[in-house]
Each structure stands twice: as C-alpha cells, then as structure tokens.
C-alpha cells in the first residue's frame, strides 16, 4: 500500500464518522503549491470555499504553499462560512497529518470564529 492509498483510507474512515453525525464539515486539501478548504453541509453541498489559488487570497502572499498561506485560507474560510450562517463544523483533514499547514489552517479558522 502506497502513501496516497493510506491517506485516502484514513480520509474515508473519518468522513464516514462525520457523515453519521450529520454536521457541516471543514474539508482541507493540500498540494505542494496550494491549500484548499471547503465547508460542506450534511447534504454534500458546498457552503463556502477558499484557497490559495484564488486571486483575493494569493495576491497578499509571497508564496502559496507555506504555513502563512494556510493561515490566510483558514481566516478566509471562517469569514465566508460565518457569513453563510455556519459557525459549528467538524474538521475533516482528508487523511493528512494534523501538522504544519493543516494545523495552521485549523488554528486560524478557530481564531476567526469557527467552532470545532
């Protein structure tokens, strides 16, 4: 089993548990160049989204694949979710370790007002 398959198995297991709860989830995906975040409701509809690929976020950053960029995405996704009336979410790290950019995004979203 390779690294990607292991990550996807962890992600599937976590998503099933979150699905049973029937709550909104904050989904994080990262690539070497960008960080993406979406708030998805219980009916699998995207409520809010933010990423370093967006011009609004990336133009204030020097580099889009680091911890500072993830913090900017976390703050932006929290603001957009709160605008739509979502304040409580479950954190779906998509099988990535809770470390570095994933942890930075989560911390920034919490500081901006999301609860999880």
UniProtKB/Swiss-Prot annotation:
Write out the GO MF terms.
5S rRNA binding; structural constituent of ribosome
What the entry lists under InterPro entries is as follows: Ribosomal_uL18_bac-type (IPR004389), Ribosomal_uL18_bac/euk (IPR005484)
Query: Which Pfam families is this protein grouped with?
Result: Ribosomal_L18p
BP GO terms, sorted: translation
Keyword terms = Ribonucleoprotein, Ribosomal protein, RNA-binding, rRNA-binding
Q: List the disulfide bonds.
A: none
The keyword GTP-binding appears for this protein = no
Recorded GO cellular component terms are: cytosolic large ribosomal subunit
Q: Which PANTHER family match?
A: 39S RIBOSOMAL PROTEIN L18, MITOCHONDRIAL, LARGE RIBOSOMAL SUBUNIT PROTEIN UL18M
Purpose of the protein: This is one of the proteins that bind and probably mediate the attachment of the 5S RNA into the large ribosomal subunit, where it forms part of the central protuberance.
Q: How does it assemble?
A: Part of the 50S ribosomal subunit; part of the 5S rRNA/L5/L18/L25 subcomplex. Contacts the 5S and 23S rRNAs.
Q: Which family does the UniProt entry place this protein in?
A: Belongs to the universal ribosomal protein uL18 family.
What is the protein named?
A: Large ribosomal subunit protein uL18
